[in-house]
Structures are given as C-alpha cells and as structure tokens.
Amino acid sequence: RPALLNIDTTRMFVDPAFPQCGRLMPELIEALTDITECFRTLDLPIYYSRRDDRRHPVQRGIWNLKLGNTDEFIYSEDPRADEWPEAYAPREGKDVIVFKNKPSCFFETPLESWLRYDRIDTLIVVGVSTSGCIRAGVVDAFSHNFRVIVPEEAVGDRSASAHRANLFDIDMKSGDVEPLADVI
C-alpha cells in the first residue's frame, strides 16, 4: 500500500522570493501537482513534512554550528514561509503533516508509527532537497523496511550536480529512482 511523502516543499524552499529556493522549482512544482492529483484521484494517503519552528538556539541544536547562529537560512519571519503552494497543499483532516527538526522526517518524529498504523509499505518520496532531506528521509525509510520510489522530476536541489549524484546513490542503494510518468 503506497503513500506519497512530500518533504519540505513549503514556500520557503520552492518560492523564488525566499533565498533557500532552488533553480529547478518551476518544473518541480508542476511534477508535485501532478503526483498529488494522482494520489488524490486514487484516494491514497499523502504525508507532508516540514521544519518545526526552531526559534531558540537550543531547539536548532547543531544547526547553529553548521549554519552559524543566524536565522537567515533556517528561519524566516515571513508567515508564508511554512505554507505550501495551493496547487498541492495539504487538505485539513485528510492529509498528515509531520514536523521535524533534522533532515530526516523519521528522526525523533512519529512518522514511522503513523505509516505502520496506516498499513503503508511503499513510499513515493518527493520534495527538496535531494542532497539533504530527501536523501536522509529515503535512507531512513529504507532502514525501516519501506520500499522507496523517487520520481526523478518530483525532487529538486539548489545544486544540479548534488541532485544528480544523490539520485544515483539513492537508486543504487536505498530506493528506485523512476520517471514521474512511470510512477503515476
């Protein structure tokens, strides 16, 4: 039983108004919209993950060392930052949202438990960024014995070379990278 796992595709990461946005985003939004519509038509479960609100340095933890003690990259004052574009936004009472503090949406969250309760055995993983949160989530999903499929047009990264290298590694080790048309 498959579920769609949409990782970090809030405006903060897909809207060019935010500095975290990557270059591949117009095509990515179209792919996210298409696969979301497919899952909704088939009445299959959709899970979303996004960052938790990490205003205090203790809550950000080791991010402080990696990114510096600034809010520029991991926090935005703009209230739209944590919203999803309307084209594929979660539906209240229907879709599930998991809040995370680290790259993997499985790390110290109830996601695995929720997926098991929902009898999910396969995850279609979409979102950003391929070299960070996508890869971390895919490896953890694989480690929890979920089959993982990544539609290559439905993931993105700020770095094209990192994107390609991580898709190669995912396909070799922990998931199946497939064309979006084959997944739909």
Positions of predicted regions on the chain:
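Active-site acidic carboxylates
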Residues: 1-92
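Active-site-adjacent betaalpha module
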Residues: 1-3, 37-42, 67-184
